[in-house]
Every structure is written in structure tokens, then in C-alpha cells.
Amino acid sequence: KVDQAVEFTASLPYKHPLNDKLTGTVGYQHKEVDDLVNTFEADTVYASIARNIYHDSGWNRTYSLRYRGDKLTVDPEKYSTDSLPYPFNNYASDYTQQALLAGYAINKTVADNMLTPTWGYSQRYSLEVGAKGALSDTNMAILRAGGTGMYTFGKDNKQQVIGRLDLGYLYSGDFYDVPYRSRFFAGGDSSIRGYNTDSLGPTYGGENFLVGGDALAVGSAEYNYEFRPSFRGAVFTDFGNAYDTTGEYDNATAVSIGTGIRWQSPIGLVRLDVAKGLTGDNNDVRLHFFIGSPL
């Protein structure tokens, strides 16, 4: 859960009043993880500047530079030093990490109607790199790719299917020097519903200390039916996890199921879901709320 967060963002046109803009962001976040996995706190300061260029071809490009510094604090009353993964076992209860990443991203959405689509697809790709010594604790590269598709069919277009897939890979000179919040985690509204945000991923030893992963694979499949004008009932399943490709840590693929209501409102699609995780113990039914197109 996020306990405290503050962020300031400013945007202004650059070389075109509508299709080219600069955006700057600075912020602070305090996050406490206490989800039957570990008691852990992360204090993060971050800043970024990005140039967003919208092209007539539909491909939107983003050039970015972002910095984040994480201070990690472990509850010393819950863990002994010997029970913690490196580097926490060398730095007692506090550890500071940082990274400066230069990035490039492209994305494209094709649909019959951007506000109220009945068919379409989106695709997105990004790459961020950082160099050790240049305000980064290690050499690293983060690659992401994802896509979403929607198709409506049947009499009066009452039936609809939606699929989503998101993949990621993190290369680093030393994974333990990658800032904690820059690693891959899964769970939450836009990941695997039925689980808390970022509560899934590789864990360390018998203490189940959540360390994050260097790979990500998350997917979703949904079927919905229009039972009255502008209203649809949906059933769905989400699946995947953040993974450790070295084999040092174990974690299973997480699966959840759920149902929900979709309302095509004047301001866009409103989605209300309830979901429950099927993998792991003590999974409560969770409520998820969204406004906007699923593409």
C-alpha cells in the first residue's frame, strides 16, 4: 500500500502546440509492504523530464530521463541480519540505492472509436538504460513490451472479448544494486487483479522476503456481454508474475478470477471488478475500479 505520496507535474508545448510537449515531474513516495510477505518500507524521491511527440502515423514517441533514489528500511524486530538477502545482510536495517535512466518509448492504438471502442488494439514498447557511476549503482537496462486487443461480435455486437499481455526483462551488472522499486513486481489493478499492488514476485528463503524479479510476464483474458444498452457483465482471469531468471528464488505463476460490470458513460468506460487470487494462501476478494478504455 502507498502510505504517503506527493507529486508535482508541469507540461508545456515544445515545437508544436498539440503534437509535441515537454513534461517534468518531481515527487516523493513512502510505501509500506506488509502483505503476509514481509514488513518493509521504501522511501523514494524521483524526478523526470520527458518529451512526447505525437505523429500522424499513430506512433507516439517519448524520450525521457528519470532519476530515482530508494531508501529501504526493514523492521529489525522481525528479521535478524542473517535472515535477509544481500545487500541487507551487510547494511543492517537501512540501505540506499539510486539510478539515472535514459529512455525511449513508442506506442500506438488503433480503434474504431478512441473513446468508446468496440474493436481495436494497442501496442507499446520501451527501453531504459543506466550506467554505473552516472548516478546509478550498476549498469542496467529495462526492456518492456505489451499489447491489448478487443473484438466485438454476435447479434447487435453484444459479445466482446479482450486480451492483454505485458512482458519485461531487466539486465543488470548486479541485480542487488538495482533500486528496489525499479525491479519487476506483479499484482494490482493494471496487473493481476485479486492481489495487492506489487505484492507478487520472487521471495527470499523461509522468511518470504519479497525481493522482486528481473523478468515479467502478465496476461489477462476477458469475456463480456451487453445485457442492456451501455451495460455489460464481464468474467475474466488474470495470470503471470514477476520472475527470477537465475533460478536463485522460487515463485509460482499467480492466477486470479473475477467478474465485473462495464458502463459506457458519457465520459468513457467505467469498469468495476471484484477478483480473487487462486494462488497462495489467505487471498481476500478485492475490489478494482477503472475509468477509461481498456486499450
Where do the language-model regions lie?
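Outer-membrane beta-barrel domain signature
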Residues: 33, 40, 66-73, 77-79, ...
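Extended beta-strand-rich architecture
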Residues: 5-9, 25, 54, 101-263, ...
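Gram-negative/organellar outer-membrane beta-barrel architecture
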Residues: 1-115, 119-124, 193-194, 198-205, ...
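Conserved active-site loop/cleft motifs that coordinate metal ions or position small ligands
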Residues: 233-236, 270-275
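Outer-membrane beta-barrel proteins
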Residues: 33-42, 130-140, 278
